[in-house]
Amino acid sequence: MRIAASAASFGILLAGCRADTVPPEQLQRQGREVVALFEQSCAANGGDSTKVTVWAESRQAQKLVADEVNKLPPGMMESGVQAVWRIQKDGADYYLGLSPDSCSVKTAKADENTVRQQFEELVKRGAQGANVELRADNAAQSPFPIRQLSYAWRPAGSGSETVLTANTSTSDRLPVQAALMLTHQVYHSAPILEQD
């Protein structure tokens, strides 16, 4: 399943031990900002690549060339990413990525509790009449602490859903402490039954 794969890829790659420390207040600001950017870019535009691109250009985000993307820490971007923008705010870098089936916003440092709280508020606020369904609330401690919170927006009776996922960590040994992702998938409420 895509959700489990995103959590696994988030936790597998390391950038080495990071010695830089960020004050708690700044981590909270960065937690609020990463969710706000995700809401404005990915969620508000349904992950549509054309709309997300227009949004990034309107914000004068710096579009990265392939060489710059390749120099990002492992795990900062998904394999197969087609476009990446860097947004800098208050000394922090946020990366907006578009892949064929997803839209993501990530940052190296953010307060985990702030990200999760803001993410849950976004999920409820942004549903616009769709059903909000919890898909995952997982935690792992080994090899590093990682938490995953995933919800789906699904209009009543729809055969597809929009899945919003927040992968977070408190570990300074991971290159990304907050990774927010939007994907679309077919909704499977029950096994398909064959009739004879």
Give residue ranges: language-model regions.
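Glycine-rich, aromatic-bearing surface loops/beta-hairpins
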Residues: 142-196
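Bacterial N-terminal signal peptides that target proteins for export
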Residues: 1-7
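Terminal, regulation- and interaction-focused segments at domain boundaries
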Residues: 22-51, 95-117
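Long, charged/polar, surface-exposed segments that mediate recognition or autoinhibition
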Residues: 81-149
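C-terminal motif of bacterial Sec signal peptides marking the signal peptidase cleavage site
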Residues: 14-16
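N-terminal secretory signal peptides
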Residues: 36, 40-89
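Bacterial signal peptide processing site
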Residues: 18-20
